[in-house]
Amino acid sequence: MCIRDSKGSVINLHPSLLPSFPGMRGIQQAYEYGVRITGCSIHWVTPELDAGPIIDQKVVRIEESDTLESLTKKVHIAEHALLPDVVTRLSKSEISTP
């Protein structure tokens, strides 16, 4: 399926708090930039990279002791919590499509 043919019905799970750090290396970029919070976002897919309307986000705090590896694990845990919640809300029509 092509994104341009999806009529706004495709969601994406992204490993940053969009609009910050779009693209494939969101966790690494947040870590290298030195921000104190990051997280994950679920958004509607549009032709523009990671620019669709945001459905929901989950915050992850970056501790002084975090390594890139530990931060990656924390963001993945947040993603695994957020995605089923959003899918459930979509299935119950609690979230409208764009």
Enumerate the language-model features and the residues they cover.
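Donor/substrate-binding cores of folate-linked one-carbon enzymes
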Residues: 4-98
